Amino acid sequence: MGKPTGFMEIARQTSTELPPEERIQNFNEFHIPLPQDEQQAQGARCMDCGVPFCQAGMMIGGMASGCPLNNLIPEWNDLVYQGKWDLAVHRLRATNRFPEFTSRVCPALCEAACTCGYTTGSPVTVKENEHAIVEYGYESGLLTACPPPTRTGKTVAVVGAGPAGLAVADYLNKRGHKVTCLLYTSDAADE
């Protein structure tokens, strides 16, 4: 942990959003990100707890707690704080096959499990830090499409197009197989 007192010295700060009246005019990004130095300061708020519940991804009392992907949250928060953005991208990709969209749609269970949130009432901005890492990855060319060098000629069908099905499809595609994802829908659900 780069700044042991970061959670006491630095207030939680999140990105601003364009008003809905402006958002409906186009399909552009409507979250206005923090400047990089301010985002790095948010990474310093992570306490690197002895037991980081934020990355635990477990059920407690029948409720989900922490990141279901077991993302190494304290590690990449510290890398963000240190300005080691390249390493943060690699660390995030170690546990998350799709950070480019999970950083946008994630319900941030990690923030609900954040010890800093329990002690100060203000959890670390994990979701925003993850999104900043992803945006840096695209801007720097670290996150790009990586087609396999050769194809095996085999075709595989994956039943299910949720996160698990897409992760399997991604893995098989990287191995050179042609993959088709099938999504099952019930006609009864439409009634």
What are these regions (language model features)?
Residues M1-T155:
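Ferredoxin-type iron-sulfur electron-transfer modules and their immediate structural context
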Residues A157-K178:
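N-terminal Rossmann-like FAD-binding beta1-loop-alpha1 element of flavoenzymes
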